[in-house]
Regions:
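N-terminal [4Fe-4S]-dependent radical SAM core
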Residues: 2-3, 28-31, 37, 47, ...
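Long, intrinsically disordered low-complexity tandem-repeat segments
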Residues: 5-20, 35, 41-58
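C-terminal scaffold of the Radical SAM
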Residues: 68-70, 89-113, 118-383
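Local cysteine-cluster metal-coordination motifs and their immediate loop/turn environment
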Residues: 76-87
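Short amphipathic alpha-helical interaction segments
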Residues: 381-393
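A short, conserved structural fragment
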Residues: 395-405
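Minor-groove-contacting beta-hairpin "wing" of winged helix-turn-helix DNA-binding domains
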Residues: 406-410
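Short, amphipathic alpha-helical interaction segments positioned at domain boundaries
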Residues: 414-426
């Protein structure tokens, strides 16, 4: 679906850096169908909305809310590109980290003017490979955020890391820099599959990294990929049992998908047989739930209280900023919701677009969607928005569970989420 076009900010990015000139103090303008939102540097706690020339300006609207608010920092650089990865990343061994981080800080300043009365509840460093960032620069980013926004006392500050670092003090340095949640990209628990997946670490390095993370952090997670080439159910069952025994607070289990544009796609690698992938998924849910890791989202399992707070911002439709190349965000200003899809450009979401996003993300969660919250967030009546005939059909197929207050996908339904959304919104 095509979104309404956003207005340009009136200033141009520097061709060399991709960032706006540091000396600029831009006026930010967003065109919508019924309003012009016009904010200049400094009055960021308020916006002015002019509906038409005859009515003039309406009273200023405060931005401050009590909802969670997060900041995502995207580091797109990697030492190598995994053959299954379709995220935006660049293979570069040497980059000017200090200069890039300066640009990130400028972008944080820019958005702080719009949101500085919000309290930051989570910061997440993703990629790419954000563990390549120098720890002192990570500390600089965290400190800068804390200077620009109130930072919640219990803020979750998470970073994704690979197990193959040649820096022996990496994890202690990251902890000292302010990271309090560490997620390790293990992906497989045997050397052969690690090679197939294009990972640059071996199993010995994975175990060493896990030992260090468990020692240095109280909040931690590992990622594994299932439905790998030639993997059978018995092999995955053994791997799940191992993963549950390590003692990590959180586990992410992702089914391998063959995405267009990836190396696996270009090689014509077939996806896993559907029934096998379903068996793996169902065993994962059952075993981890029985061993202290209940599923809370389609790919995520956690000991109670250790669910990823930052990722829940996405699934709950909360506000977050995206900093760095290809990073995106969502932001509510006044009564309007905006998508931050391009560098410092905000595109207004229609109520229908907002509703579709809430459905797509919320149905990933085991608890589903609270209909009252849905209506508050998009301004549409749930029953009027949903295709009632298709809803009843999906309930009969045991893909959805619908009550007076909530709607949620069953285990089977979460495996075909795209189809569910298409049907419900048709």
């Amino acid at each position: 679906m095509e979104r309404s076009s956003a207005v340009d900010t009136g200033v141009r990015k520097d061709a060399g850096t991709g960032f706006l000139p540091k000396s600029s103090s831009p006026e930010i303008r967003f065109k919508t169908e019924d309003a012009v939102i016009n904010t200049e540097r400094s009055p960021a706690a308020y916006i002015e909305v002019r509906e038409d020339a005859s009515t003039g300006f309406l009273p200023k609207l405060p931005l401050k809310t009590d909802f969670p608010f997060g900041i995502y920092i995207h580091w797109p650089y990697c030492l190598s590109k995994c053959p299954y990865c379709d995220f935006f990343s660049q293979v570069k061994k040497n980059v000017e980290q200090e200069e890039i981080i300066k640009g990130y800080l400028d972008d944080l300043d820019f958005y702080a003017e719009l949101t500085k009365e919000r309290t930051v509840t989570s910061i997440s460093f993703g990629g790419g490979t954000p563990s390549l960032i120098k720890p002192q620069l990570i500390e600089k980013i965290i400190s800068h955020i804390a200077q620009k926004w109130p930072l919640a006392d219990n803020a979750e500050i998470s970073l994704e890391a690979n197990p193959n670092s040649d820096r022996p003090d990496l994890f202690s340095d990251l902890r000292n820099a302010g990271i309090n949640r560490l997620s390790l990209g293990i992906q497989a628990l045997n050397d052969n599959d690690l090679k197939i997946l294009g990972r640059t670490h071996n199993l010995k390095q994975a175990y060493q990294a896990m030992e260090e993370v468990l020692k240095r952090f109280d909040n931690h997670s590992i990622d594994l990929i299932y439905a790998r080439p030639a993997q059978n159910l018995s092999q995955w069952q053994q791997e799940i049992k191992q993963a549950a025994s390590f003692g990590f607070k959180h586990l992410s289990m992702y089914q391998l998908t063959i995405e267009e544009g990836t190396v696996f796609y270009k090689k014509g690698l077939p996806p896993a047989e559907e029934n096998l992938a379903s068996e793996m998924y169902n065993f994962t849910n059952r075993y981890l739930s029985e061993h202290g890791y209940p599923q809370y989202e389609i790919s995520n399992y956690a000991q109670p209280g250790f669910e990823s707070r930052h990722n829940q911002l996405y699934w709950n439709g909360s506000d977050y900023l995206g900093i760095g190349k290809s990073a995106h965000g969502r932001l509510k200003i006044g009564s309007k919701h905006y998508a931050l899809t391009h560098h410092r450009i905000m595109e207004e979401l229609t109520s229908e677009e907002r509703a579709e996003e809430l459905l797509l993300m919320g149905l990933r969660l085991n608890r589903g969607i609270n209909k009252q919250d849905f209506e508050k967030q998009c301004g549409l009546n749930f029953d009027n928005f949903i295709n009632a005939d298709k809803l009843n059909m999906l309930i009969a197929e045991k893909m959805l569970i619908n009550t007076n207050t909530t709607i949620k996908a069953t285990d089977s339904g979460r495996l075909i989420l795209n189809r569910l959304i298409e049907e419900l919104c048709s």
